[in-house]
Amino acid sequence: MGRDARRLPLLPFLLLLLAAAAGVAESATDAEAIHDLARSVPALGWDGDNVCGFEGVTCERGGAGKVTELNLADRGLSGTLPDSLSSLTSLTALQLQGNALTGAVPSLARMGSLARLALDGNAFTSLPPDFLHGLTSLQYLTMENLPLPPWPVPDAIANCSSLDTFSASNASISGPFPAVLATLVSLRNLRLSYNNLTGGLPPELSSLIAMESLQLNNQRSDDKLSGPIDVIASMKSLKLLWIQSNKFTGPIPDLNGTQLEAFNVRDNMLTGVVPPSLTGLMSLKNVSLSNNNFQGPKPAFAAIPGQDEDSGNGFCLNTPGPCSPLTTTLLQVAEGFGYPYELAKTWKGNDPCSPAWVGIVCTSSDVSMINLSRKNLSGRISPALANLTRLARLDLSNNNLTGVIPDVLTTLPSLTVLNVANNRLTGEVPKFKPSVNVLAQGNLFGQSSGSSGGGGGSDGDSSSSDSAGGGKSKPNTGMIIGIIVAVIILFACIALLVHHRKKKNVEKFRPVSTKTSPAESEMMKIQVVGANGISNGSSAFPTELYSHVSAANSSNISELFESHGMQLSVEVLLKATNNFSEDCILGRGGFGVVFKGNLNGKLVAVKRCDSGTMGTKGQEEFLAEIDVLRKVRHRHLVALLGYCTHGNERLLVYEYMSGGTLREHLCDLQQSGFIPLTWTQRMTIALDVARGIEYLHGLAQETFIHRDLKPSNILLDQDLRAKVSDFGLVKLAKDTDKSLMTRIAGTFGYLAPEYATTGKVTTKVDVYAYGVILMEMITGRKVLDDSLPDDETHLVTIFRRNILDKEKFRKFVDPTLELSAEGWTSLLEVADLARHCTAREPYQRPDMCHCVNRLSSLVDQWKPTNIDEDDYEGETSEMGLHQQLEKWRCDDFTISDSDTFGSFNVPRKYNG
């Protein structure tokens, strides 16, 4: 024992020696790489053993010998780069620009600390297959004027989430515009000029709100870059835009709020009216609009040094000023179609009649006919057509028009023919005068008949619905009158019946009693929510039928609730919860108590809403909640199975979650008896919650906002998979008759700043709360903890303060977590996401779909148990086209606050 005790003090010394030996070995590896480079590039003139003393080589402080910077810029060096260069794993800057280096660029995948990479102006012949892999700290990448073979921007660039500048002009980049760049939300400077890019700008580029300089000009491919340039409207920090010499189409978007100084779009195919949001930019110093197909008034810019907009456009006048009323009207019509290029080629000048614009026929200098059939038009029909008082014939058939036929077109005094056949118009056909022949078949109108108005037209689809004379109208009129009378009588009978029932049921519902009169059983029924909505609930569920179902023990709970037309009386709920016994209480919330119930051998959760808090709006709020919840079906949202109303009573039946709440697993371990969650389990739960909220925000038929997202509203099943609950007081994002315009809902600590101060509700309110939950999952702390010192009570504040120091932050992490090196790396990524989600300004927070994509890569990497390959097949198999497109729209997303926070690995502003 004594001998062993004497040996113990030697252990730390031995470990120290081993660490020192490892450091020496790594330093030796760096030295070997530098010597290899000296041999490959003799002109460097490096000689000796002290590589840290070589010109252009910088080593870390302390004499460990690790090379941190290699600056060989503009030295006219020739030679090749050795493969051993990849062993410089501590390198933060590799600057090789302005030389004549040849051969292949070696793999750089091990340089996880590399922040600056400059390859410009060399003669490299190829890039490594793993180019940009592993460069998670990269901030500046410049590789202009390289004679490489054609290559696409690799998807691995998405890992460079801190990338500030990507400059690769004249670098042989080919293929469609790389949509992966939309994930680089820290990107401020993007220069891809003089390459071979094709296709349009992905809509996802609108997420690049930090962009200051965008240069895509002079693509050399035959097709060039094309399509609209709408994405630049969201780039509010943009100062320089060069997209000249491409094939972009459509109008200039609204540029209000931007900071543009240089705007060069010459030599494209842009159309439309130059917007006042561009001409009124006080920051603008240089503008070039030449050789497009701009229309309307000539723009009047303030005095700026560089201005070029005259040549090659179709402005109505040679000097700034308004166009003629007729020209203005037709340009408004073109605006509805998105200013199509085929029209813009001839719709120029200030006189549509001389020479006549394509599709325009004039009589006495006024438009009498418009024929734009088969012009591949999309967009909407403009109400401005009503200003053409001499218009007799309007043919917009066989296009792709959407929206409705404007009612105002019925006021056209000279109109005789309206042909909108074979489009995608919706709504109803307005009621035109009998003299108007309307051709509207082949659309998506609510009625099977595609026409209205017109008398005696030869086309079988253009007949008047009310102008036919003779005996046919009288039987139809009699039939209609009979139906109306019958409906009135029916409603009168229903009203009397309801009044009679209300008088019989004046006594308040007593949930503690299992004895219910037949009349009460009829009124106090649970209505069943199936996959297609709420059942009509016209009659109570017979007790004998319920008993029959109870006997069928093989049926599961979903079959019990989703059988067609199935309804359960309130007796079932009373029995299931033992008269709402205290022993069955699962939890209490601001709007009521949740009980555990047993239906047909299956557990459910019955929420009994507090009648005192529902107030006079209780019925409206309750029905709105049902209307919302019946439309929401998702794997990670707690499903509503049914509901019951009587007087002030509100009862909701949900699926039962046996794993408790996330709060119990994070902050109430002693009371709940749960063991701490592992990091893998926490990541999986975080992804589940994100997917549920993502569905509410953008994949459901309507956009829903939770407004009270917190750990106690996140329920877990037996496998610790999460579902979001208690979104019954959700406020529909778009106002409807059943939107809940109530007080601010939510829990202090999880409220976004703008919501707490102004009550303004957007989806970013939920994103903020989600970020707070991520912080709780990382730290194991409550969002507000009065037991801590005053400067540490608010989790968000202390979290954002500690995240700036990686070592300090490590002590801030939940001590119950056992993290490997890989686990620590993933935790830092989640912490970074939490920081962005809780940004003060809503526009700085990511959308939930981007949170899903960022977490998905981490969860897939860890491959936690109980995640099947087809885990989400159930929610997508019935997903409509709208939801699928919205789902596919979302790419990986990170965001950078422009104020204070940098990345974990390298400074935000690199000084090199």
Curated annotation (Swiss-Prot):
Extracellular side: 28-477
GO biological processes: chloroplast organization; regulation of leaf senescence; regulation of reactive oxygen species metabolic process
Superkingdom, taxonomy of origin: Eukaryota
Subcellular localization(s) per the UniProt record: Cell membrane
Tissue: Expressed in young and mature leaves.
Residue intervals of the Protein kinase domain: 580-859
EC category: transferase
GO molecular function, one term: protein serine/threonine kinase activity
SMART domains named among the record's database cross-references: LRR_TYP, S_TKc
Cytoplasmic compartment segments: 499-912
Transmembrane spans: 478-498
Catalysed reactions listed for this entry: L-seryl-[protein] + ATP = O-phospho-L-seryl-[protein] + ADP + H(+); L-threonyl-[protein] + ATP = O-phospho-L-threonyl-[protein] + ADP + H(+)
Gene this protein is translated from: WSS1
Glycosylation-annotated residues: N159, N170, N196, N256, N286, N371, N376, N387, N400
Membrane topology: Single-pass type I membrane protein
Protein name: Receptor protein kinase WSS1
Residue numbers binding ATP: L586, G587, R588, G589, G590, F591, G592, V593, V594, K607
Cofactor: Mn(2+)
LRR repeats: 64-88, 89-111, 112-134, 184-208, 235-261, 281-303, 364-388, 389-411, 413-438
Function, in words: Transmembrane kinase receptor involved in the regulation of reactive oxygen species (ROS) homeostasis, chloroplast development and leaf senescence.
Signal sequence segment: 1-27
Family: Belongs to the protein kinase superfamily. Ser/Thr protein kinase family.
UniProt keyword annotations, A-Z: ATP-binding, Cell membrane, Glycoprotein, Kinase, Leucine-rich repeat, Membrane, Nucleotide-binding, Receptor, Repeat, Serine/threonine-protein kinase, Signal, Transferase, Transmembrane, Transmembrane helix
